[in-house]
């Protein structure tokens, strides 16, 4: 893509992360035994917020309206020269690991192994028989996956500069420990805007997710062949695995026919759901506004989909290139929602 430098940003957590899902976490709000449970994997909105906050020279004024927030985020991406973000995924060394859903489980698989076994079982998969394919994936699933760590604590009160236990207000917090070398995203940066801005994040410390858990960043240039493109490669039609949720918004609609789930845009087939789950995903928490972002229906990360004939996956907005829409769909696509890794 002309005028764009491509980078791989590696996020290396130094402690377990708290990647909050929907719901409040406050012992006083729900009484005793309040609980916070981390999601298993980073959301694109968390990664985008992390990068934008590090690259900005000064804080921005909070906004109360959601669509005003969307417009402002697009302005910030343009100002910082961030054309697109694709991912995230896990990696051990240079080997990418991608999420896969089997029933209610989410685990991670070497992308090359996944593509190999998918092609071997393709004839059965196209007939709707996924049992052999999923059984094989469970046998080769890797230990490079998130693990939950539960901790128990009690609420505190501050009186005259001293902290005291608030009797009866217990809480549990389940953090996620990412068992891999790093979490990766691929970023297209406008070569003419803020030159070297992403490169200066190399070696920087970052606060990730809830409670500001610490991670270290590493930035590599992809153009020189240093890193392999996983989610930033463009293609048309074919099978792919979702690295991040594909948020479903009008004019997209779900159609169920003969046991198959497909997504249509108008009368055209957009994609078919081969395996995985349709559920709900929140778009994160805005620290500046101190409020949660909206929740939308989505095809969840780890699902395998088939882009219908003529449907494109592009670097700039991913699969949303096929969907006419406004600023929200543009933002979702640019920050990485609907990121795909092709399976051939």
Language-model regions, residue ranges each:
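Conserved active-site/ligand-binding neighborhood in enzyme cores
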Residues: 2-344
